[in-house]
From Swiss-Prot:
The gene is trmD. This is tRNA (guanine-N(1)-)-methyltransferase. S-adenosyl-L-methionine binds at residues 113, 132-137. It comes from the Bacteria. It comes from Oenococcus oeni (strain ATCC BAA-331 / PSU-1). Homodimer. It is an enzyme of class 2 (transferase). Keywords: Cytoplasm, Methyltransferase, S-adenosyl-L-methionine, Transferase, tRNA processing.
Amino acid sequence: MKIDVLSIFPDMFDPLRQSMIGKAIEKGLIDFKVTDFREFTTNKQRHVDDVVYGGGAGMLLMPQPIFDAMEEVKKENNGDKGHVILVDPAGRKFDHHVAKKLSTYNHLTFISGHYEGYDNRIRNLVDEEISLGDYVLTGGELASMVIIDATVRFLDNVLGNSESAADDSFQNGLLEEPQYTRPANFRGIQVPEVLTNGDHEKIRKWRLKESLRKTFLRRPDLLEKRSFNKEELDFLDDIKYEESLDSDQ
């Protein structure tokens, strides 16, 4: 996958070159480049922003540097600008499903803004607008990094274990069940016995039930978006009964 980023703070993306993503870059699984669109300004002061027409607080990113930077991206990629993403609070909310969809593109280009916002004409370059949530950051760099990190996890051979992404929270519409490692007893806190007895079917059922329980208690909204088989419905009935007993104590 080719990933281009347009930003006036390219050094902020250096952490993405570490850990698993860094290894994926080294292996050639990801071609990652950040373009400083300040380099494409035409004014002497190298300003990338200007005042808002009609008045108003703050400054807006001007279209010219970003349009010219995008032309450079196209030139470097044989006319391909990629699937262009504008990171903006007004975009659709980012989630697991969006990340998985983005991972199917061969080329992604992120426009990471700053200041008060963008000249609206910049949106003529954009294929999709994405938001991390109902809050505003000082710039789009952090949001772009989150989206990139979550997306590339779905690429083949990026994660060390091919099952890691498949087992993540949200992969099957549920939160991941509680997990444990050695020792089996730590300061009197015991790993559930079912996980140590070697019965794979019992372990599967425990994991499914505890995944449902965790989702029921912490993110019940996820259950509203999901269909269930009979086993899951039976587990949910058990969970609701067990939790009602706990709340009465």
